[in-house]
Design a protein with these regions (language model features):
Chain A
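Structured, non-membrane catalytic/scaffold regions adjacent to prosthetic-group chemistry
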Residues: 2-206
Length: 206, 234
């Protein structure tokens, strides 16, 4: 840390709206839009080609197609999201199926401690299993009442809103439960293995 | 694949020079207190602190070559309603200091492989310029060409430095006497510039990058050889 450095002539103008001050993690700024950041081309997945699989250290590997996924119980997340590129979107909502609901069917084995999420197109990200359970994560197909747009990961993306948003893998198709942490795409490319925005865990070693 | 140099802590850099690249973009030449190695394509995080302790961070691509060992350069496109870019463009000048950390990113980096096609839209040229400059300084034998799309001549960064290795396209208006009418990149432009078995680096606004990545797929590039970096406030 730099202790006391002041940027000459800087006063700032993106302070969060009144009443939302406590909702911005360190180093984040308030963004009213929904920026798009993706590695490589934007995937085009039709719902009739869409599948979601939960495998690895589970009692039953389970695979859903779009129709069987739509038949699962649904819940909504109301709150904030934080991107490692510094923007935070406050007061948004997503709905879909909680990861708890998926794991209820797959039944994790006791030694499962980590999850590697894989997307159509091959993107991967790793998340501790504890960060995906107890109502903290979803496979979301709806954003603010509308089908999730393709550029935001539609038809469905992982949603782990308490971690930086690269963990919320767009176009997710597989959750693999593992005993050991296996780093995903950004985690191998300089980004933090867990990514807690409140601890500002942006990069490897933060 | 070699690992890219990883990020170090915050430090104060001296702004040793600053100059406009276009009416709305400025390059800052920064001398680091504790220099680090980096690869072309990596970026830095800049942190501004107000007198009341309020801080703002943003990321900026490095424009200079790692072979330029004495300082790094970042080019900042001024966003009209931005918080940090107007400060960097309008307020900060040579003799000031700037807090930053880097180098960041291990994906959109050039490690010397070839052949390489660079496609930049607007200020998306910045990290590509680091690659172009580094190739000129260290690896002139690596085949490399650039397609650069800008709205008007006034939006073109590094105009005096782009040579035969860069092809320019104007989407709104070209310079006086420019032979082509204004237009966007076409499938034929990308197909003509494509290298079989090459890497492609694409950087620019989201819509531009999406469109170019699709054109590269059509031109036969597999997705894993299309490296993208998307810019833009929304």
């Amino acid at each position: 840390m730099s202790g006391g450095f002041i940027s000459r002539g800087f006063f700032g103008k993106r302070r969060p709206p009144e009443g939302m001050e406590g909702r911005l993690p360190p180093g984040q700024y308030y963004e009213s839009g929904f920026p798009v950041l993706t590695v490589g081309p934007t995937e085009k997945i039709e719902t009739d080609a869409w599948t979601l699989r939960v495998d690895g250290l589970v009692e039953h590997a389970v695979e859903w197609n779009w129709n069987s996924f739509q038949a699962l119980p649904r819940t909504t997340y109301e709150g904030d999201i934080h991107c490692v590129t510094k923007w935070s979107k406050l007061g948004t909502n997503f709905s879909g199926v909680s990861v708890d609901e998926l794991l209820k069917l797959a039944q994790p084995q006791p030694e499962a401690k980590y999850v590697l999420a894989t997307s159509f197109g091959g993107y991967t990200t790793n998340v501790p299993l504890a960060d995906l359970v107890d109502g903290k994560a979803w496979v979301a197909d709806t954003h603010e009442g509308q089908p999730l747009p393709r550029e935001h990961g539609g038809p469905a993306r992982l949603l782990v809103p308490h971690l930086y948003f690269w963990k919320s893998a767009k176009w997710v198709t597989k959750l693999t439960l593992l005993a050991e942490d296996e780093w995903g795409f950004w985690e191998r490319n300089g980004y933090h293995h867990r990514g807690d925005p409140w601890k500002e865990q942006r990069y490897t070693g933060d | 694949m070699t690992d890219a140099p990883s990020v170090t802590g915050w430090q104060i850099a001296d702004v040793v020079a600053a100059w406009p690249e276009t009416p709305t973009a400025k390059t800052l030449r920064l001398k680091l207190a504790e220099p680090w190695p980096f690869l072309p394509g990596q970026h830095v995080d800049v942190r501004l602190t107000a007198p009341d302790g309020y801080q703002a961070q943003r990321s900026y691509s490095i424009a200079s070559s790692p072979a330029d060992a004495h300082a790094i350069e970042i080019t900042v496109q001024r966003l009209e309603d931005g918080e940090v870019s107007p400060y960097l463009c309008d307020v900060l000048e040579a003799g000031d200091q700037l807090e930053l950390r880097g180098p960041i990113g291990g994906y959109f980096v050039w490690r010397g492989e070839g052949p390489v096609l660079l496609i930049g839209g607007g200020s998306g040229l910045v990290p590509l310029m680091s690659i172009l400059r580094h190739r000129r300084l260290t690896a002139p034998d690596v085949p490399m060409r650039a397609l650069v799309s800008v709205r008007t001549p006034g939006d073109l960064l590094y105009a005096g430095e782009l040579g035969d290795d860069a092809r320019l396209l104007y989407t709104r208006a070209g310079p006086p006497g420019w032979a082509e009418p204004p237009r966007r990149l076409t499938p034929a432009d990308v197909a003509d510039a494509a290298y079989p078995d090459g890497l492609a680096f694409v950087c620019g606004p989201t819509g531009f990058v999406d469109r170019v990545a699709d054109l590269l797929l059509q031109a036969g590039y597999p997705a894993e050889r299309i490296l993208t970096e998307r810019f833009g406030p929304t």
